[in-house]
Structure formats: structure tokens, C-alpha cells
Amino acid sequence: MASFPPRVNEKEIVRSRTIGELLAPAAPFDKKCGGENWTVAFAPDGSYFAWSQGYRIVKLVPWSQCRKNFLLHGSKNVTNSSCLKLARQNSNGGQKNKPPEHVIDCGDIVWSLAFGSSVPEKQSRCVNIEWHRFRFGQDQLLLATGLNNGRIKIWDVYTGKLLLNLVDHIEMVRDLTFAPDGSLLLVSASRDKTLRVWDLKDDGNMVKVLRAHQNWVYSCAFSPDCSMLCSVGASKAVFLWNMDKYTMIRKLEGHHHDVVACDFSPDGALLATASYDTRVYVWDPHNGDLLMEFGHLFPSPTPIFAGGANDRWVRAVSFSHDGLHVASLADDKMVRFWRIDEDCPVQVAPLSNGLCCAFSTDGSVLAAGTHDGSVYFWATPRQVPSLQHICRMSIRRVMSTQEVQKLPVPSKILAFLSYRG
């Protein structure tokens, strides 16, 4: 069994350049478990980076200061303590334009977190009440944390203060995602087999419960235009939801094991799902077609082997903001960077016990969290996108596959616009 196809020479694949690392503090002597970093996230405006460093703690650091610290210290021996020192000096130096860092004790093990930013003109989708406890301004930045006890806590990123405590799940909250349109609509995925929709502009009231999963729900993601939601879970489940009507659109079938992560491309034309079956699939969410398969074990395992303990479980997947690259993280101690039109990684990086990953807001850095609560950063593959790709993304942001197929253009252009050529 190999990690790459026989035609590929592993030594010829480019190694990603390490940017830096944030090492978790030593575990308390009375804590034998709970130190995993299950989630990392970048703020939508790139101002903050957050990760769960285990033992109930979430760390919020100004991303620009963190990157500056990496440059000052080089790519090795950079810890969270050095980043802490830099941020603290800036905050005490009277520079008000420098955002402060925060260490947040969430009260229980943190399984998920997500940033949300508000747009004042976006009204609540559910009710229009004159009085609200919270009136979020244009510069409001929130952090949602999903806990082991089923609670969701909402924090003010700039002050580190707790704003809301959302209570309804009866098991751990495995993933959280905010609608990217600034409406502060939050969706939570839980091991209680449900997804719940919360409206933070309505003081955190629950809008809807989405039920279709028969087992744990691992992850969820909004499409860029907020019209669709993807949810994935145990028993090979991949569901697409209409978020205007809160109804299920379709179930995508093809995986052979639990599906644990999902992400949409920036134009909403593609959907990537990662599974314990050693594969990442790229789908067309508008018609359910499978477009691409990224394998992590060769020869490709049979469904029986893929559905078991195959030592190549894919833990995470993330789309780059250029729409050209996908990152995946697997149990073979490797991070892979893929082009959407190639079935072999263009770059790789070593990582033991990886659990999660996320691209920075500008797509230049990938952050990955590990079993011991640390975070590692790599420079991502960068290239100037072609004019054709830029035009394709612009078109696909506003047109579904069905609408594209009706365009009076040559078949080759239709194939390109549909990510089939």
C-alpha cells in the first residue's frame, strides 16, 4: 500500500515551506485527556486566528502580529508564548489600533469554533422586533464555540467577554458555521444527529432543527451565497439543504465510510467532502455529480477495506480562496495540497496526528491543528490564476450548473464552466 499512485515519484513532489508553529502549553498533571486541537479558524477579515489548545481553552491571537512574529523568529522554535509576548507588548504600549489577544476558558472541552461578522443592514430572517438585547454594529466580530456538553457559547472577539449561551443540543457540538452574508445566522452540527439553526441578530433564538442524519453529524458548511448548506456525518452521510426553505435538496452517495469534513469552493460551484474511506470527493452540488476523486491510499482500497480501519483516514479538507487548490489532512502523517484539475498532490508537508486544517483569509497560509493542541503553518501553493479561471468563478458565483448549461456557447466552454474540462 502506498500514499501515491505508482506513476508518481514521491521525492519529486514539492515540500511546503513551514511558516511557523504555535505549541500548546504543557498539560496539567491531573489531565490525562482532552488536550486535542479539534478546530482552528481565521476571522473573515483576517484580523484574528483562533484555535482550541485543549483543556477547555481557546486562544485568540491577532493574525498580523502572529505572522510578524514568525518572520522575526524564523520558521523554527516559534511557540505560542513568543506570540503572546509580542501581542502583550503591543497592547500595553498604548497602540489602540493593535487588537488584543485573549485566552478564553470555555468551561468544557471545545470541539468546534467559528467566526461571525455582522452587516447592520442584514435583518433577522425570522422576526422583526423593535427591541433586542444585542445590537451588533458594523465592526462586530463574534466567536462561537461548541462544547462537549452540547452548549454553544458566543464571545465578543475584541473584549473576550461572553455574550450568549445557546442551549438545546443534548450531545457535543461537533461543528459550527456562520452564514457568510453577515446575517449572523449560525448552524451547529451535533452528535445528537441534528443540525440547529440559530439567529444571533434575534438574540440567539433557534430558528429550525434539521433532521435527516441517522448517526453523528460531523461537519457542516454554507455555500458562499448562503442558499445551500452541506452536512456530513457517520454512515457515509452527505446531505445538501435548501437554506431558504430549510428542506433537504438531495443526498450525495459514493463514500464508503464516515464523512467527517466538507467545504464549498469560493464560487459555490464545487463541494469537497473528506471521509475515513481514504478519499476526498469533489462534487457539483447543483446536480450531485461526482467530478473528482483525491485518493490517499494506492491501489484504491475495496469498499470493505475502505469502510474499516485502513490507517489512511482523511480528517479534514479545506478549499483555498483562489478556487484552484484543496488541502487535505490524513492519518498517514501528511498534509496534501491538490489542484482541482489534477489527481496528484502538487505539494505535501509532514504532520503527525493532525486533526483539522483551515486556509487563511487570503489563502497564503494553511493552519493545521494536532492531537497535542499545537498548530502548524505552511505556505500554500500560489500562482496567478488564469483569466479564464477568474471569469469562470465570476460566472459561477451567480449561476448554477443548470443555468450554465442553458448558455448559448460552445460545448467546450460549457464543460470548462462546469469544471469538467
Swiss-Prot record:
A GO CC annotation given for this chain: cytoplasm
Domain remark in the UniProt entry: The SOCS box domain mediates the interaction with the Elongin BC complex, an adapter module in different E3 ubiquitin ligase complexes.
Primary role: Probable substrate-recognition component of a SCF-like ECS (Elongin-Cullin-SOCS-box protein) E3 ubiquitin ligase complex which mediates the ubiquitination and subsequent proteasomal degradation of target proteins. Recognizes type II iodothyronine deiodinase/DIO2. Confers constitutive instability to HIPK2 through proteasomal degradation.
Residue ranges occupied by any SOCS box domain in the UniProt entry: 372-421
Protein name stated in the entry: WD repeat and SOCS box-containing protein 1
InterPro entries in alphabetical order: G-protein_beta_WD-40_rep (IPR020472), SOCS_box (IPR001496), SOCS_box-like_dom_sf (IPR036036), WD40/YVTN_repeat-like_dom_sf (IPR015943), WD40_repeat_CS (IPR019775), WD40_repeat_dom_sf (IPR036322), WD40_rpt (IPR001680), WSB_SOCS-box_domain (IPR051983)
GO biological process, one term: intracellular signal transduction
WD repeat placement: 124-165, 168-208, 212-251, 254-293, 309-346
Gene3D superfamilies listed in its UniProt record: SOCS box, YVTN repeat-like/Quinoprotein amine dehydrogenase
Keyword set, alphabetical order: Repeat, Ubl conjugation pathway, WD repeat
A Pfam family it matches: SOCS_box
Quaternary data: Interacts with DIO2. Component of the probable ECS(WSB1) E3 ubiquitin-protein ligase complex which contains CUL5, RNF7/RBX2, Elongin BC complex and WSB1. Component of a probable ECS-like E3 ubiquitin-protein ligase complex which contains CUL5, RBX1, Elongin BC complex and WSB1. Interacts with CUL5, RNF7, ELOB and ELOC. Binds to HIPK2 through WD40 repeats.
PROSITE patterns: SOCS, WD_REPEATS_1, WD_REPEATS_2, WD_REPEATS_REGION
Pathway(s): Protein modification; protein ubiquitination
An example Gene Ontology molecular-function term: ubiquitin protein ligase activity
